[in-house]
Curated annotation (Swiss-Prot):
The keyword DNA-binding does not apply. Its EC number is 1.17.1.8. Catalyzes the conversion of 4-hydroxy-tetrahydrodipicolinate (HTPA) to tetrahydrodipicolinate. This is 4-hydroxy-tetrahydrodipicolinate reductase. GO terms for cellular component: cytosol. The lineage of its organism: Bacteria, Pseudomonadati, Pseudomonadota, Gammaproteobacteria, Enterobacterales. The active site is at residues 159, 163. It is found in: Cytoplasm. Its main location: cytoplasm. GO terms for molecular function: 4-hydroxy-tetrahydrodipicolinate reductase; NAD binding; NADP binding; oxidoreductase activity, acting on CH or CH2 groups, NAD or NADP as acceptor. GO terms for biological process: diaminopimelate biosynthetic process; lysine biosynthetic process via diaminopimelate. The gene is dapB. InterPro entries: DapB_C, DapB_N, DapB_N_CS, DHDPR_bac, NAD(P)-bd_dom_sf.
Length: 273
C-alpha cells in the first residue's frame, strides 16, 4: 500500500449513504476501500462492495464481523444508527482505529461516550460533512452576532420520508452555532414544536420546523426576521455524494492525528476565518 493512502471501512454498506461512501472511497485519490460492513443476517453479506454500490468490482467482500477485518482498515466511517455506532466506537477504541462519525440522533450519554473515546483515538464527529453546510455554519455565527439580539430566529429543515430523527443533526448544529454566538445554551432557548394556542413568540428563542417528504436529500434555512426585513441563509443538497466526499476528506485528514475530537470545521480550517 502506498504510504500516503488511508484504508477505510464503511458501515452500513448496503444503505443509501453506505453505497455513496463506497463509490467515493473507490474514486478518491489517496483512499483505499479496505472493508465494508453490514448487519448480521443481511442478504448482502458476501457481495462485492463495489458492485453493490454500482462502482464496479472492488475485491472487498461485505462482511458482518469487525473482528474479521480489523487489520484491513485505519479509519472506520459510520453513518448508521446511534446504537450501532456506539458498538463500533467501542471496537475502534479498543483497537486504536480512527473514526469518522456522521450518525445523528445521539442522546447525551452517546455524545459523552464519543468524547471519552476521543481521549484515546482520533474522531471527526459532525452533523453534516458537506463543505457548503459547514461554510453556512460559519456564516450563521457571523449573522447571529450582528442580528441575533434584534431578530426572531427560525430554523427550517426538510428531508426525505425515510429519515428517522428530527430535527436533523444539521438543524441542531445550526441552532448551536447561533446560540453559541449569542452566548446562550441551545437547550435553554430552543422551541421544537408549536401547536394550538401558543401565545406570542417569546423573545430570544430559536424556533425549529421540520418537513419530511418524498426524496429530499436535505434542505436547511436559518431565518433572521425583524420588522420590515429578514435575512435567510439556505443550503440545499442535491446528492448524498457531497456528504460522502466530505467524510472521505475527513478520513484523509485524520491520518496525522493520534487522538482528539474534531468536526468538519476543523478539517476545513474554518475556525481561523
Amino acid at each position: 500500500m502506498h504510504e500516503a493512502q488511508i484504508r477505510v471501512a464503511i458501515a452500513g454498506a448496503g444503505g443509501r449513504m453506505g453505497r455513496q461512501l463506497i463509490q467515493a472511497a473507490m474514486a478518491m485519490e489517496g483512499v483505499q476501500l479496505g472493508a465494508a460492513l453490514e448487519r448480521e443476517g443481511s442478504s448482502l453479506l458476501g457481495s462485492d462492495a463495489g458492485e453493490l454500490a454500482g462502482g464496479g468490482k472492488s475485491g472487498v467482500i461485505v462482511q458482518s464481523s469487525l473482528e474479521a477485518v480489523k487489520d484491513d482498515f485505519d479509519v472506520f466511517i459510520d453513518f448508521t444508527r446511534p446504537e450501532g455506532t456506539l458498538t463500533h466506537l467501542a471496537f475502534c477504541r479498543q483497537h486504536g482505529k480512527g473514526m469518522v462519525i456522521g450518525t445523528t440522533g445521539f442522546d447525551d450519554a452517546g455524545k459523552q461516550a464519543i468524547r471519552e473515546a476521543s481521549q484515546e483515538i482520533a474522531i471527526v464527529f459532525a452533523a453534516n460533512f458537506s463543505v457548503g453546510v459547514n461554510v453556512m455554519l460559519k456564516l450563521l455565527e457571523k449573522a447571529a452576532k450582528v442580528m441575533g439580539d434584534y431578530s426572531d430566529i427560525e430554523i427550517i429543515e426538510a428531508h426525505h420520508r425515510h429519515k428517522v430523527d428530527a430535527p436533523s443533526g444539521t438543524a441542531l448544529a445550526m441552532g448551536e452555532a447561533i446560540a453559541g454566538a449569542l452566548d446562550k445554551n441551545l437547550k435553554d432557548c430552543a422551541v421544537y414544536s408549536r401547536e394550538g394556542y401558543t401565545g406570542e413568540r417569546v423573545p430570544g428563542t430559536i424556533g425549529f420546523a421540520t418537513v419530511r417528504a418524498g426524496d429530499i436529500v436535505g434542505e436547511h434555512t436559518a431565518m433572521f426576521a425583524d420588522i420590515g426585513e429578514r435575512v435567510e441563509i439556505t443550503h440545499k443538497a442535491s446528492s448524498r455524494m457531497t456528504f460522502a466526499n466530505g467524510a472521505l476528506r475527513s478520513a484523509l485528514w485524520l491520518k496525522t492525528k493520534k487522538n482528539g475530537l474534531f468536526d468538519m470545521r476543523d478539517v476545513l480550517g474554518l475556525d481561523v476565518l
